[in-house]
Amino acid sequence: MTLNNVTMRQGTVGMQPQQRWSIPADARHLMVQKDPHPCNLRNRHSTAPEEHCRRSWSSDSTDSVISSESGNTYYRVVLIGEQGVGKSTLANIFAGVHDSMDSDCEVLGEDTYERTLVVDGESATIILLDMWENKGENEWLHDHCMQVGDAYLIVYSITDRASFEKASELRIQLRRARQTEDIPIILVGNKSDLVRCREVSVSEGRACAVVFDCKFIETSAAVQHNVKELFEGIVRQVRLRRDSKEKNERRLAYQKRRESIPRKARRFWGKIVAKNNKNMAFKLKSKSCHDLSVL
């Protein structure tokens, strides 16, 4: 996934770097159009060729069989979850805030981030919203976040069981808010580096993802483990639901070409066994819920 540009957005109210949003009486500046279009977005600066290579965040080699002839695509991704689970840290890593002095990054705020990536040979721009608050007075914002996303990252901390239980509640709320839509959702167990403080096992996270029909991944924002894979995955999940069958088949063929032979054999054998064994089918689904390249 190659970084092309980064933009961060916010309303006109000046704020300190570490402040979170509070909702003013007139919150119209928070409203986001449902279908962003390139013409409506602020002009962005492209990186110099050498910077483009140096700051590559790529998931592909140069032998991609898929072109980006249809142009750039925009996806609005919303971070939700309990306070203190690492949502803002994930957002900052995504936006390149930690190395912003070395990047061509225009800082307009702290709660909305925009970044253009190349995943499987095709450009996609993620507009990442990190405006979820847990205070009661922000109920309007909760409802707004539940409605505007093209995809959702429900984040919990593996060191905090209460945040895991809250993540399950948020998945139910999201299902109710978007009943007729097949919205991509990834359950994100953050802080995986804190092994000795773990309260939620990997198997529990996977089981929850299977029950609530979403994907699952564990990350560590502190050491940036699986963060790249997370944002690659959410792009792929949206594409799988939106794009034509033929286009997705080409992407799948590209991914399978890079897959090892032993892994192909295990996947094929697993499908055969699962046909006649419901328990095995559940186990395989649990194992596949972390594969962000398939539905």
From Swiss-Prot:
List positions binding GTP.
Answer: 81-88, 190-193
Q: Where is this region: Calmodulin-binding?
A: 265-284
Q: Where in the cell is it found?
A: Cell membrane
How does the record say this protein sits in the membrane?
Peripheral membrane protein
Which keywords are on file for this protein? Cell membrane, GTP-binding, Membrane, Nucleotide-binding, Phosphoprotein
GO molecular function terms attached to this record: GDP binding; GTP binding; GTPase activity; magnesium ion binding
Q: Where is the segment annotated Disordered?
A: 39-64
Chief subcellular site?
A: membrane
Query: Which biological process annotations from GO are given for this protein?
Result: chromosome organization; metaphase chromosome alignment; mitotic cell cycle
One Pfam short name:
Ras
Q: What induces it?
A: By mitogens.
CDD domains given in the database record: RGK (cd04148)
Q: Mind telling me how this protein is modified after translation?
A: Phosphorylated on tyrosine residues.
Superkingdom of the organism of origin: Eukaryota
* GO-annotated cellular components: cytoplasmic side of plasma membrane; midbody; mitotic spindle; nucleus; plasma membrane; spindle midzone
UniProt xrefs under PROSITE patterns: RAS (PS51421)
Known role: Could be a regulatory protein, possibly participating in receptor-mediated signal transduction at the plasma membrane. Has guanine nucleotide-binding activity but undetectable intrinsic GTPase activity.
Subunit-level organization = Interacts with calmodulin in a Ca(2+)-dependent manner. Calmodulin binding significantly decreases GTP binding. Binds ROCK1.
Q: Which family does it belong to?
A: Belongs to the small GTPase superfamily. RGK family.
Question: In its UniProt entry, what is this protein called?
Answer: GTP-binding protein GEM
Name the species this protein comes from.
Mus musculus
Q: What is the lineage of its organism?
A: Eukaryota, Metazoa, Chordata, Craniata, Vertebrata
Question: What is the gene name?
Answer: Gem
